[in-house]
Amino acid sequence: MKLIIQAGIVILMIASLNNAAKCALEASGEKAPIARGENLIAGAAVNDSAGSSDLTLIIQLKIDGKIVVDEGHKCTAIQPEENIPSDKDPTGWTQPKFDDKDWEKGEYGVGYGDNDDNLVIGKGDLAMVYSRAVFEVKSIRSNSKVELGADFDDGCVIWINGVEVAREANTDIPDEPEWDSWTDKGSGHSHEASKTDPPTYEFVELDVKVIGNPFAVEPADKLATSWGEIKAGY
């Protein structure tokens, strides 16, 4: 009897490890575009299926060992009921210049139902909660060490300055997530947040692409418009 119980425990441990390997944060392979100064990180917390009892996303971002985003970082959030800003551009909300002034304001984490959310938002009959946060970088190099961590339930997708850099692996979330994308449309995917204090993050390392100010108005656009107006006057 003792041997049978021990064998059962081993099987459960192996199954748990296999599930952890299947359900983990995974880097997209795209370089994270990061500027010196202000940057934008955006995250979608994704439910597994309709009627989910809880949803969570907490993000941590470290650059060369310095934490620039963490639990308690100021953010905005919304639970979408349509693609934002449009069906033609369902991830346009991840861009730095997107106007989120009408979104709810609070601090990471975001979600509902499990007492680990600073900004409580959402309900189980909708698939996602979107969040955005501005963070400051004083120094960045192409060889900077960038570590992205997330504590989440059930899935997540994360963008930096409009570029997807990581997501939960082995879900049914499409390549370009829409407002009604669930993690489980037959895959059986499920993932629980740590519910620890402080959060227990899953980490990935990101390569870096150093960029200019992502919030800046493009001078070239201004010039083209002005020149077009000048020509139109003749």
Language-model features and meaning:
Residues 126-129, 137-147:
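Extended extracellular/luminal ectodomain segments enriched in beta-structured repeat modules
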Residues 14-21:
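C-terminal segment of classical bacterial N-terminal signal peptides
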Residues 217-234:
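Short acidic, low-complexity intrinsically disordered linear motifs used
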Residues 113-130, 190-201:
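Extracellular beta-rich ligand/substrate-recognition surface
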Residues 174-196:
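Beta-strand-rich, non-transmembrane domain signature
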Residues 23-114, 136, 145-153, 160-179, ...:
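Accessory carbohydrate-binding/adhesion or oligomerization-edge regions at the termini
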